[in-house]
């Protein structure tokens, strides 16, 4: 019998997956899997169990938000495991699932995992950590990891928006230098993202035609602080239209980025806090994971 490691965050989102647990497990059992179930107990737990047990099963499935997926992927990669992954998105934002058009219905997502085939995708390595879809700094970065879990559960995605609004008074420019595949970009930026996704924070959407989550390249977006109302309007219009040709924006693709910044500048990796670095290298790991999905969902 095939073995599955099922990792579930019972606190993710509005806890909507919890009431479907029996049906999820039934779906997997009927598909011929012996299911080893692990409920996460706190931050880092999914990484630990994926690292310990991920090599010894045929499939690892995680149920939770972007953070749970990040931890699961991190555990598998740190163990050198090439085990296929299934993902049931049950968080507040689910940017990764949105980019891949994965089912947001819990039971449909479970069915997709057992009926689908492994599709290869890239993963980012940030220093000695991993991220599945984004490493970002600057405006609204803090709201992704500082919003209390009970508020996320009560308000869902709205919690991030409200928390971001309260952060407006704390926004400052960050002086950052980046060596992007041998070219240098330096300046004071309001926001920056190194991503492998069309959705960032559920608010900012990149042009799907310019994003391929399996091409070995990141998309890099840097936003300089507008100095007047005209520049604010121009910047917003460029982001909304997904035409990144205004003076405040830098948008390009790259495989590797070396970053020099204030060591006190915080980052977020897939919505989870990462401490600042004076120097850090970010690298695209081409086809580092295999995610089970139906072919018609392949982004």
Regions found by a protein language model. Give the residues of each.
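Short Gly/Thr/Asp-enriched flexible loops that form oxyanion-binding sites at enzyme active sites
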Residues: 68-80
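ATP/NTP phosphate-donor binding region
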Residues: 1-63, 298-299
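Short conserved active-site loop signatures built around small residues
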Residues: 46, 66, 192
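Catalytic core of DAGKc-family lipid kinases
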Residues: 31, 40, 78-191
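ATP/nucleoside-binding phosphotransfer catalytic cores, i.e., glycine-rich phosphate-binding loops
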Residues: 180, 186, 212, 222-299
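Glycine-rich phosphate/pyrophosphate-binding beta-alpha loops
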Residues: 136, 140, 193-209, 273
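Gly/Ser/Thr-rich active-site loops/lids in small-molecule metabolic enzymes
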Residues: 151-159, 199, 208-228
């Amino acid at each position: 019998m095939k073995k599955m490691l099922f990792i579930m965050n019972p606190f993710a989102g509005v806890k909507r997956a919890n009431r479907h647990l029996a049906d999820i497990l039934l779906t997997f059992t009927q598909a011929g899997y012996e299911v080893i179930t692990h409920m996460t107990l706190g931050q880092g737990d999914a990484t630990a169990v994926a690292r310990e047990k991920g090599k010894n099963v045929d499939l690892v499935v995680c149920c939770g938000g972007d953070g749970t997926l990040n931890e699961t992927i991190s555990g598998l990669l740190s163990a050198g495991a090439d085990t296929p992954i299934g993902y049931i998105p049950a968080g507040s934002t689910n940017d990764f699932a949105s980019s891949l058009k994965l089912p947001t219905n819990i039971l449909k997502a479970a069915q997709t995992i057992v009926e689908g085939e492994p599709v290869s995708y890239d993963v980012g390595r940030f220093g000695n950590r991993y991220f599945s879809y984004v490493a970002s700094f600057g405006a609204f970065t803090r709201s992704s990891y500082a919003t209390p879990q009970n508020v996320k559960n009560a308000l869902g995605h709205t919690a991030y928006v409200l928390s971001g609004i309260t952060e407006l008074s704390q926004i400052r420019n960050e002086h950052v230098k980046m060596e992007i595949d041998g070219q240098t970009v330096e300046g004071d930026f309001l926001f920056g993202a190194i991503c492998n996704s069309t959705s960032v924070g559920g608010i900012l959407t990149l042009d799907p035609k310019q994003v391929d989550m399996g091409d070995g390249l990141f998309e890099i977006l840097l936003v300089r602080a507008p100095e007047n109302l005209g520049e604010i309007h121009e910047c917003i219009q460029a982001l909304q239209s997904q035409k990144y040709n205004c003076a405040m924006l830098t948008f390009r693709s790259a495989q590797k980025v070396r970053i020099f910044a204030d060591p006190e500048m915080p980052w977020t990796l897939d919505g989870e806090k990462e401490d600042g670095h004076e120097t850090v290298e970010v690298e695209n790991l081409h086809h580092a994971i295999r995610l089970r999905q139906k072919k018609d969902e392949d982004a």
